[in-house]
Amino acid sequence: HLNFRTVRFETEALDTPNYQGNAVVNYTEREVPYTRIIEHKHFEMFGQAVYDNPKTVISREYSTEWKEGMEPYYPVNDDRNNRLADEYRALAAAERNVIFGGRLAEYKYYDMAPTIESAIRAFNAEK
């Protein structure tokens, strides 16, 4: 089977009105054990009352190895997995009346906008 990475979240409420000033901050340093911190109140949909609250909620995201029963998030980009993904793509191409798409089916990392674009392209190709 194809290998994936997954994530786990640790969420906590903090006694500060603003922890990081942004909804998402990514961390790429090897010494930092998490990949990003999400401060939920900074997503624009909540309104001023949430920003005025003297507390905030953050979630730290940790990348971890995927195991059976866990949700797969990210493909593992190495030779073995890429070769196996190519084999699966060849099998998928032989199927009729089925569209395989998204991170899992394409074995490709996608942000949301390219995911939607890929889905529209796949749909239009079936017309």
What are the functions of these language-model segments?
Residues 1-91:
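Mid-domain catalytic core of redox enzymes
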Residues 71-127:
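C-terminal catalytic lobe of FAD-dependent flavoproteins
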